[in-house]
């Protein structure tokens, strides 16, 4: 009997943990943007510093994809989306999705990638990773705090930078982790979901 109770408790705990953490699986992706490193006399900035891959991540990109060439991309079973690696020129990918919680919710978005990236929420920069690793297995994971109001749309945009010097292909995994108190709050993560407008939008 004790063993049965223990097994049931483990199953319930596992179910709650699974419900509290989910992988994002669909993204809207803008076609890669070529970013060339300055050469010759332009190879240093006004401060006399050499241009670096970290600086390339600061290249301005229009986050609105309404008129941009895009495609829908699905993650694999591990939750990873993978893109073509830069060959001669650096490449910037813009990856977008949307979050909407049914009720007020707090949690975090865990982002894992072996290349450099910057994350925006509703157009505001929230996190920058300016170093690269040798493989996805060694990739650093960073967490972005979330505070979602009921039925509000939150646009997540990630700039992913691939350089010829990177040791691996650019890939990305995002996981939504709800705080314990909000495990049962439903939250959609669909890049194609229709926006909901409030009085502030009119």
Map each language-model feature to its residues.
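Accessory carbohydrate-binding/adhesion or oligomerization-edge regions at the termini
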Residues: 21-78, 98, 155-202
């Amino acid at each position: 009997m004790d063993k049965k109770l223990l097994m049931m408790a483990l199953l319930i705990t596992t179910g709650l943990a699974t419900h509290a953490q989910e992988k994002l699986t669909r993204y809207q992706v803008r076609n890669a943007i070529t970013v060339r490193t300055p050469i010759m006399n332009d190879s240093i900035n006004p401060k006399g510093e050499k241009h670096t891959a970290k600086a390339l991540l600061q290249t301005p990109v229009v986050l609105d994809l309404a008129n941009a060439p895009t495609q829908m991309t699905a993650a694999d079973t591990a939750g990873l989306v993978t893109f073509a690696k830069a060959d001669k020129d650096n490449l910037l990918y813009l990856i977008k999705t949307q979050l909407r919680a049914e009720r007020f919710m707090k949690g975090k978005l865990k982002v894992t990638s072996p290349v450099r990236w910057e994350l925006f929420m509703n157009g505001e920069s929230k996190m920058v990773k300016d170093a690269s690793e040798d493989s996805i297995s060694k990739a650093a994971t960073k967490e972005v705090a979330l505070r979602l109001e009921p039925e509000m749309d939150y646009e997540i945009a990630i700039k992913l930078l691939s350089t010829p010097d990177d040791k691996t292909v650019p890939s990305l995994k995002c996981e939504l982790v709800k705080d314990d108190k909000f495990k049962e709050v439903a939250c959609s993560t669909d890049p194609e979901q229709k926006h909901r407008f409030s009085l502030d939008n009119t």
